Amino acid sequence: MGSKHNPPGNNRSRSTLSLLVVVGLCCFFYLLGAWQKSGFGKGDSIAMEITKQAQCTDIVTDLDFEPHHNTVKIPHKADPKPVSFKPCDVKLKDYTPCQEQDRAMKFPRENMIYRERHCPPDNEKLRCLVPAPKGYMTPFPWPKSRDYVHYANAPFKSLTVEKAGQNWVQFQGNVFKFPGGGTMFPQGADAYIEELASVIPIKDGSVRTALDTGCGVASWGAYMLKRNVLTMSFAPRDNHEAQVQFALERGVPAIIAVLGSILLPYPARAFDMAQCSRCLIPWTANEGTYLMEVDRVLRPGGYWVLSGPPINWKTWHKTWNRTKAELNAEQKRIEGIAESLCWEKKYEKGDIAIFRKKINDRSCDRSTPVDTCKRKDTDDVWYKEIETCVTPFPKVSNEEEVAGGKLKKFPERLFAVPPSISKGLINGVDEESYQEDINLWKKRVTGYKRINRLIGSTRYRNVMDMNAGLGGFAAALESPKSWVMNVIPTINKNTLSVVYERGLIGIYHDWCEGFSTYPRTYDFIHASGVFSLYQHSCKLEDILLETDRILRPEGIVIFRDEVDVLNDVRKIVDGMRWDTKLMDHEDGPLVPEKILVATKQYWVAGDDGNNSPSSSNSEEE
């Protein structure tokens, strides 16, 4: 009720003015926070604190179930207090659950079995938060991250000593510098790739997906990105500490893996090319089994590059401390296996040999018979043993047809109908539903960018989709500023062949186990339907702790699932030093599927989570 000195109209005007001022200040602080949140040190934490205090409700809103969700019944019961997860011991800061060193040494060394995945049983799983090392800082933005890594993030100097003469990595002040050298490219990765490009069509989009077996610090993959080629690099967790960790700190795709006794976690015909640059894989061992596995994942018409022993043995036999006869015999044996796989040697000069796989088996001229693999599903590879057999080409109707289907050049390949779909090989997916999936994920990613304006910038370089489906999320996000590891859960429909046919990369994985990577290697994780999928297979807590392990401090996770599932997820992550917001579906509050956005707080070993790292100035683009 207004007084004569303050009539009601004035009160309303002042209230409106006050509201506008508050909203204006709120938005100002939000934008200031976003601008400051360059991903480096105190800028991140200050911006997060400002945003937390201001809480602009017109930018990001919490769900209000009561007035809107009449069709979604939320049980009204007292929420149990969330479990607060404690930090793991600091010595576990680089813990990799399925490649843990003490456990690995209990397994045979034969065929590199001890370097393969050996995950802990349920009663030995860690249920604590893996800490970041003291001084941890958000990586430099791409492309600077290709050349520089903060020492505090991966404090391992062994490679600077062991590979000092090979220009792999140098230690300068408080950073590692990666000059782009390598054992087999002393003139730099660019010069090496240019030589390959004189034979292989690397620059025109014909080659989009590549495999680097035994990648070192992934300089080849890093410089292939300049040619718009995505390289899946892998190396074991071995004496060269942190090879894969360095690769991911640089913003280059990589996993911990080895060619050993089990099949690689990729579908058949996934890669346009593969290379071994002094990777030390014994290609002639076990009757050529490892080359047969490379052949399985290499597309018809694809290329295999071998640089290093035994190529150019006449020059290097003394350096390698091996006899001419031994090296000559090894090269002849490799070439014989290649012929049996229907590969043709296209080039040999200096330290490099290049082979090309025939486009189908009609032009094969094998001098010796080979055993073909009898398994019906060549993509059923999870924990399956490698066999000494050749994966047969898909059938063709004429000599000019590419077995398995010809792919368009990239980027047209990204949205073209993949052969697996046009041939009806993916149950329940046709050309129409594929196009619907494209449109759906374009819409959803646009919505994500409204939630967080830094999505699509260099702030989030390493991205993972935990349940990738047809690769729609990654395709909608496609940009030189980021790359996406598309994970196909082993208990879901097998669509990884579609992901690769679109010119994207990915891997099979079971989320009841640890992922084959180091801690703190992803900036942004997307989890659509993951927890509905796994809620009866293993503990959601274990999947979330693994998500926390591989997520960088101040990285984000976007969960998309049924609201009751997300409520269960939220109760767990509230005890994991994450900040969360539960939000409506893009199509409105009546849709039972919701979105949970989470940010991992910055904290390091030994502190209480309130400290910030030192600053490193840079801006996202």
From Swiss-Prot:
Lineage top rank: taxon: Eukaryota
Lumenal topological domain: 36-621
The UniProt record lists the keyword Membrane: yes
Biological process, per Gene Ontology: methylation
Signal sequence extent: none
Membrane topology of this protein: Single-pass type II membrane protein
Location within or outside the cell: Golgi apparatus membrane
Documented EC number(s): 2.1.1.-
Keywords of this entry: Glycoprotein, Golgi apparatus, Membrane, Methyltransferase, Signal-anchor, Transferase, Transmembrane, Transmembrane helix
GO CC terms, sorted: cytosol; endosome; Golgi apparatus; Golgi medial cisterna; Golgi membrane; plant-type cell wall; plant-type vacuole; trans-Golgi network
Glycosylation sites: 321
Top enzyme class: transferase
InterPro entries xrefs: Put_SAM_MeTrfase, SAM-dependent_MTases_sf
Cross-referenced Gene3D superfamilies: Vaccinia Virus protein VP39
Transmembrane segments: 15-35
GO terms assigned for molecular function: methyltransferase activity
Ranges facing Cytoplasmic side: 1-14
Family membership: Belongs to the methyltransferase superfamily.
Name used for this protein in its record: Probable methyltransferase PMT14
Species per Swiss-Prot/TrEMBL record: Arabidopsis thaliana
